[in-house]
Amino acid sequence: FARQVRIGNGLDRVDMGPLAARRELERYLKVLEQAKTEGGRVLAGGGRPAGLKRGWFADATVLGDVPPGAAIMNNEPVGPVAPVCRVRDFNEAITLANRSRYGLGATIYTLDLEESMRAVRELEAGMVWVNAPLLDNDAGPFGGRKQSGLGRQLGAEGLDSFRHTKLAMIDYAARPHDFWWFPYADAESFPGSRGGTK
């Protein structure tokens, strides 16, 4: 699949455009090099696309055999790369995914409904996709957990981030009340006080 991604100018019929800036491309290529020195094996991509020397283009990349402790498995690479490592079982997959300090989104592929619901429940991510990566709905919230951003965009939760909730309590009688001040047991509204309850 990664080899079929058409890369180029976003005004053309392509699947993926360039990274945002030269420094982002340089940073991303360093991330890939570090992943390779830590044991990752390039299965597809791994550099810059042939024929696109001008611009900040990078290959869609798949890395295999990446050790769970590699930096790319624990940091956001912010680039077109899928680092892959083998796990013993579902429990280990959840544990490894959750140990990252980031939690924007997670994708799981399974035909087991119980397993998919457990992943949705246990993955520490703002969004979880099951068998449908990056399927989107503008009525739903977009955002991460941990160090993957603050708040939510889109949906009711996104609108809430533009509101400021305020509590205002007004007593139009404007007479002093003593029930918030010490000694509380002597307050006029305290149950069992001389004045009874109001």
Residue ranges and their predicted role:
Residues 1-3, 37, 50, 57-198:
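Conserved C-terminal structural/oligomerization subdomain of aldehyde/semialdehyde dehydrogenase
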Residues 42-45, 130-132:
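General beta-strand structural signal in soluble alpha/beta enzymes
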Residues 46-52:
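Short, solvent-exposed loop/turn elements at beta->coil junctions and helix N-caps
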Residues 5-11, 22:
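Active-site region of PLP-dependent enzymes
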Residues 11-17:
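Short linear capping/connector segments at secondary-structure termini
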Residues 31-36:
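Helical element adjacent to the flavin cofactor pocket in flavoenzyme catalytic cores
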Residues 20, 43-45, 108:
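Short beta-strand segments
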Residues 19-29:
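Short beta-strand to alpha-helix junction loop
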